[in-house]
Amino acid sequence: MEIKWHDSDPETGQRRFLCAERFAGVWNFRWKLQRRGEWTRGLEPTRAMWEHVLDMLERRYWRRDGVEEADIKQVKNLLAKAIRQEEIHNSPD
């Protein structure tokens, strides 16, 4: 399953194309700066990326586009983990 979208690169402000792909129960993210460019793998997903993936899965689920409830639960768990890591990283010590 693939979910594609675009956003702005937080470092440069340039438009970038993103892809979240689930294969064998594992999510991988990749990006590119040009529409027809090569994909760069190994992107570490942010909270916003997980929120976008969850939103897209929930939309597809109601249309039955190959999304199962287990997929949504998995992404919700990964999003909760990303939120916890973000809170730990941003907490004042």
Question: Whereabouts are the PLM-identified features?
Answer:
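Short beta-strand segments and strand-loop junctions that repeat across beta-rich extracellular domains
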Residues: 19-37
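Short, surface-exposed coil-to-beta transition loops
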Residues: 13-17
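Domain-level signature for proteins that mediate thiol-based redox and metal-cofactor handling
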Residues: 1-3, 24, 51-52
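A general, composition-driven signal for non-globular sequence regions
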Residues: 9-10, 24-26, 70
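Mixed-charge, Lys/Arg-enriched low-complexity segments
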Residues: 36-93
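Negatively charged, low-complexity tracts enriched in Asp/Glu with abundant Ser/Thr
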Residues: 1-12, 33-37, 89-93
